[in-house]
């Protein structure tokens, strides 16, 4: 009886123990690219609040680079554009109006 369990664990018989085989987990994630570099945008217009709303969450906070995929250079430009749009009342500071 003990030999049949060992043979099953080694996979010599028809019975195969599944929890001994490694799981196939896909670890490759799609690489995020900066949409500004890809499309060749050099200037981010602060007068276009609909475009800037893509970089702001429901609470009105700026989304981080790791979520949007923008480069550091363009993340700074997005931040200044959002701040200018908020200052000129083109965008709300608080996200209550975003819903």
UniProtKB/Swiss-Prot annotation:
<dbReference type="GO" id="GO:0070181">
    <property type="term" value="F:small ribosomal subunit rRNA binding"/>
</dbReference>
<dbReference type="InterPro" id="IPR036870">
    <property type="entry name" value="Ribosomal_bS18_sf"/>
</dbReference>
<dbReference type="InterPro" id="IPR001648">
    <property type="entry name" value="Ribosomal_bS18"/>
</dbReference>
<comment type="function">
    <text>Binds as a heterodimer with protein bS6 to the central domain of the 16S rRNA, where it helps stabilize the platform of the 30S subunit.</text>
</comment>
<dbReference type="GO" id="GO:0022627">
    <property type="term" value="C:cytosolic small ribosomal subunit"/>
</dbReference>
<dbReference type="InterPro" id="IPR018275">
    <property type="entry name" value="Ribosomal_bS18_CS"/>
</dbReference>
<dbReference type="Pfam" id="PF01084">
    <property type="entry name" value="Ribosomal_S18"/>
</dbReference>
<keyword id="KW-0694">RNA-binding</keyword>
<comment type="similarity">
    <text>Belongs to the bacterial ribosomal protein bS18 family.</text>
</comment>
<comment type="subunit">
    <text>Part of the 30S ribosomal subunit. Forms a tight heterodimer with protein bS6.</text>
</comment>
<dbReference type="GO" id="GO:0003735">
    <property type="term" value="F:structural constituent of ribosome"/>
</dbReference>
<keyword id="KW-0687">Ribonucleoprotein</keyword>
<keyword id="KW-0699">rRNA-binding</keyword>
<protein>
    <recommendedName>
        <fullName>Small ribosomal subunit protein bS18</fullName>
    </recommendedName>
</protein>
<keyword id="KW-0689">Ribosomal protein</keyword>
<dbReference type="GO" id="GO:0006412">
    <property type="term" value="P:translation"/>
</dbReference>
């Amino acid at each position: 009886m003990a030999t049949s369990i060992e043979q099953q664990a080694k996979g010599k018989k028809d019975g195969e123990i599944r929890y001994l085989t490694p799981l196939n987990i896909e670890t490759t994630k799609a690489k995020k690219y900066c949409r500004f570099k890809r499309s060749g945008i050099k200037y981010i217009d602060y007068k276009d609040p609909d475009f800037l709303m893509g970089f702001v969450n429901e609470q009105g906070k700026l989304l981080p680079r790791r979520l949007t995929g923008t480069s550091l250079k363009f993340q700074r430009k997005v931040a200044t554009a959002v701040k200018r749009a908020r200052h000129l009342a083109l965008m709300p500071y608080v996200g209550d109006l975003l819903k």
